[in-house]
Amino acid sequence: MTNFYKVFLAVFILVCCNISQAAVSFIGSTENDVGPSPGSYSRTHAMDNLPFVYNTGNNIGYQNANVWRISKGFCVGLDGKVDLPVVGSLDGQSIYGLTEEVGLLIWMGDTNYSRGTAMSGNSWENVFSGWCVGANTASTQGLSVRVTPVILKRNSSARYSVQKTSIGSIRMRPYNGSSAGSVQTTVNFSLNPFTLNDTVTSCRLLTPSAVNVSLAAISAGQLPSSGDEVVAGTTSLKLQCDAGVTVWATLTDATTPSNRSDILTLTGASTATGVGLRIYKNTDSTPLKFGPDSPVKGNENQWQLSTGTETSPSVRLYVKYVNTGEGINPGTVNGISTFTFSYQ
């Protein structure tokens, strides 16, 4: 009788110990590859439509529903961190640099791609607030990473190759009294190598690149008051564009490149004083302002020349004398403005 009791007690203790096992275990891989290997993606876009996002869907990613096994009321969330350098932003989301020409938008989160958090910066951030498994049930916790390439720089059509690159990590975050103990909590991700076949569209200038506008001779009496204007000359700019290109332009004051007003600085060869030059486009009643010599989208004082439906756009420019209010002294008037096109 005594021996039977000892055997029964030993079995009871064994069953008790099995019940008290940890409520979380790691069943995934510590190193994971994101996207097909190798990947190849092709897109066409206007030359200056930058940064240009390669919308490839969800196929550049990694998702796994079974990374941690959890049970017994265990509560778990996820944190994510990106290790790549931040080189810009788009709609509040960081653009991470891969090469000088190619960057990434990155999302991290729960198993489902659609619930991923848009990543910003290089610190750990909450990418899945979490949940608690039932006290008498078991389940798994997964994760996902999705990336989208971004073209960063103005270039002609090109093929970009990106080597395998470490992206960052996701870690399991126990909460509400749950503890992971010695269980693996962090997994790492690397982006598989890929190529971008990038085709850009643009325009060709049909007008000579240097345009001389002869200014009409006038008398000071035609500009009696400050702000008075008289048409001095006119010219046109014509282009031939690929389909779908929207043309924007910036005029830059060549004599004073920092000038952001609507009056062109006269060159040192001018002898007249108290007079300036304004430039108008088409039938606009507001003069164009001068900006930096740059094709970057959103450049200061950039203005729209055409829409994406025009393949042979043109613009008529009118140059007007303007009384600057400093007292007019007759003489010669010369001004130089450059124009920079942006193909968006």
Curated annotation (Swiss-Prot):
Residues annotated as signal peptide? 1-22
Q: Where is the composition biased (Polar residues)?
A: 299-308
Q: Does the keyword Translocase apply?
A: no
Instruction: Give residues annotated as binding a carbohydrate.
Output: 65-66, 110-111, 139-142
A GO molecular function held by the record: carbohydrate binding
The listed locations are:
Fimbrium
Q: Disulfide pairs?
A: 75-132
* Alphabetized InterPro entries for the sequence: Adhesion_dom_fimbrial (IPR000259), Adhesion_dom_fimbrial_sf (IPR036937), Adhesion_dom_sf (IPR008966), Bact_Fimbrial_Adh_Pro (IPR050263), Fimbrial_adhesin_lectin_dom (IPR015303)
Outline the segment boundaries, as ranges, of region: Disordered: 288-308
Arranged from A to Z, the UniProt key words for this protein are: Disulfide bond, Fimbrium, Lectin, Signal, Virulence
Gene Ontology biological process terms in this record: adhesion of symbiont to host; cell adhesion involved in single-species biofilm formation
- What are the record's GO terms for cellular component? pilus
State the residue spans of region: Fimbrillin-binding domain. 200-344
- Segments of this protein annotated with the region Receptor-binding lectin domain: 23-199
Instruction: Name the Pfam families on file.
Output: Fim-adh_lectin, Fimbrial
Q: What does this protein do?
A: Essential fimbrial adhesion factor that mediates binding to N-acetylglucosamine-containing receptors in the host intestinal microvilli, leading to colonization of the intestinal tissue, and diarrhea or septicemia. Also confers adhesiveness to laminin and basement membranes.
Please report which protein family the annotation says this sequence is part of.
Belongs to the fimbrial protein family.
Q: What is the protein name stated in its UniProt record?
A: F17d-G fimbrial adhesin
Q: Which organism is it from?
A: Escherichia coli
